[in-house]
């Protein structure tokens, strides 16, 4: 039964992502601004790929991260879920794309700024009494931006600083 539950959950995640892909395509079909249309088509391609087939780029990894973060929040009602060492698990995608010229630091920062805005959107369904006291407050996200690995080596990287910059750019709690 456990494995059946895992399969059901994974299938649901893939259907969830596909719905975003469909919506992005529909929005692109109605869009008159060429730049925005291209952006929506990229979003659609990313949503068709991740998380089902795994990310191959920083942009896809950001989208996959966001889907997983949303669904974890939904499953746990926002309790004890945070991005943790985001800068570590996202770095290989960032570095590869930067090195092969498919990503600029500026666009990577824009994607991270967008994630920071979305992280601030997260909230939870509350009972009436709790809603009165907590309405409008985001869940807050704990995120580590530097540190050491198990050998004591500094593993701070560009994304560590870009996380801090994202906080400065969006200026949200």
Name every feature range the model reports, one short phrase each.
Residues 1-37:
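N-terminal leader/propeptide and maturation segments of large enzyme subunits in energy/redox metabolism
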Residues 1-6, 35-42, 46-173:
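Conserved catalytic cores of very large enzyme subunits
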């Amino acid at each position: 039964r456990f494995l059946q539950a895992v399969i059901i959950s994974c299938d649901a995640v893939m259907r969830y992502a596909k719905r975003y892909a469909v919506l992005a395509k529909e929005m692109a079909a109605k869009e008159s601004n060429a730049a925005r249309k291209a952006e929506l088509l990229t979003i659609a391609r990313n949503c068709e790929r991740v998380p089902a087939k795994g990310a191959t780029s920083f942009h896809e990894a950001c989208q996959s991260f966001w889907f997983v973060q949303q669904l974890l929040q939904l499953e746990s009602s926002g309790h004890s879920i945070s991005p943790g060492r985001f800068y570590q698990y996202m770095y290989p995608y960032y570095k590869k794309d930067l090195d092969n010229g498919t990503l600029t630091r500026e666009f990577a920062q824009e994607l991270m700024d967008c994630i920071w805005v979305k992280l601030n959107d997260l909230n939870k369904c509350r009972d009436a009494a709790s809603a009165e006291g907590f309405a409008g407050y985001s869940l807050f996200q704990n995120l580590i931006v530097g540190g050491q690995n198990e050998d004591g080596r500094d593993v701070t990287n560009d994304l560590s600083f870009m996380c801090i910059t994202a906080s400065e750019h969006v200026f949200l709690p």
